[in-house]
């Protein structure tokens, strides 16, 4: 499967870890999806999920200046997670920024409110790689 599919699973894993008050580890959360999606790039998923979790404070500080009249805590969980994922990938991978932003926009269209993809696109366009 593609990196796009891996990003969807990484998003769902991060969402699950954020909304549930649980002792579930990242590895355990990823193990749950392995049975249904054995053809995914689990090294990439693990890298992305752990990167977002380990660098969350720095990612939020990178995103905050680009949130006009918003705070990171007021964003929808889905938007916040997508912004963190994309920002981490922009800063820590060799994937072209344009590809990362486009994938984030597509995730937002799939998992967030109708017009939020425009907001996500605008914020990420201002993140320096």
UniProtKB/Swiss-Prot annotation:
Keywords: RNA-binding, Transcription, Transcription antitermination, Transcription regulation. It holds the Pfam family NusB. GO terms for biological process: DNA-templated transcription termination; transcription antitermination. InterPro entries: NusB-like_sf, NusB_fam, NusB_RsmB_TIM44. One of its GO terms (cellular component) is cytosol. One of its GO terms (molecular function) is RNA binding. SUPFAM superfamilies: NusB-like. Involved in transcription antitermination. Required for transcription of ribosomal RNA (rRNA) genes. Binds specifically to the boxA antiterminator sequence of the ribosomal RNA (rrn) operons. Belongs to the NusB family. PANTHER family: ANTITERMINATION NUSB DOMAIN-CONTAINING PROTEIN (PTHR11078:SF3), N UTILIZATION SUBSTANCE PROTEIN B-RELATED (PTHR11078). This is Transcription antitermination protein NusB. It comes from Staphylococcus epidermidis (strain ATCC 35984 / DSM 28319 / BCRC 17069 / CCUG 31568 / BM 3577 / RP62A). The gene is nusB.
